[in-house]
């Protein structure tokens, strides 16, 4: 499980699905980040009253991640209907890749070669070295500066 912070989540707002943006409107950035980190990809049913015990203890699960007020706000908003906590795959992948590249740069700063760094970091980040090389190449290509004489020639 990849945990994400509210600041990181805010950085990738454009990649979030509408359902995540709705949760942000109800709960705010910090609570939504905690909710996605804990339950992303799961459908929960927050029934209240007599049917609460049939919900599988969702209220208890929510309170393990959200404050009492946040949990109540979410339950009020949903009205007891089942709800899907989005995984936010694209946003999480973007954050993971940024973390990976940052740590790769740090490893190289300590004297490790790229290949040594990849051997250490790829398993930790759950990516293959081929994917890592693609990330490195994409970053390199995005940082290349156009020649001043070529700027705007074909744009």
Predicted regions and their residues:
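Short Lys/Arg-enriched helix C-cap and helix-to-coil transition segments
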Residues: 143-155
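DNA-contacting interfaces and partner/effector-binding or oligomerization modules
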Residues: 1-53, 72, 80
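A general alpha-helix detector
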Residues: 15-22, 57-61, 117-120
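Acidic (E/D-rich), amphipathic helical modules within compact regulatory domains
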Residues: 53-71
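Short alpha-helical "recognition helix" segments of helix-turn-helix
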Residues: 23, 110-127, 132
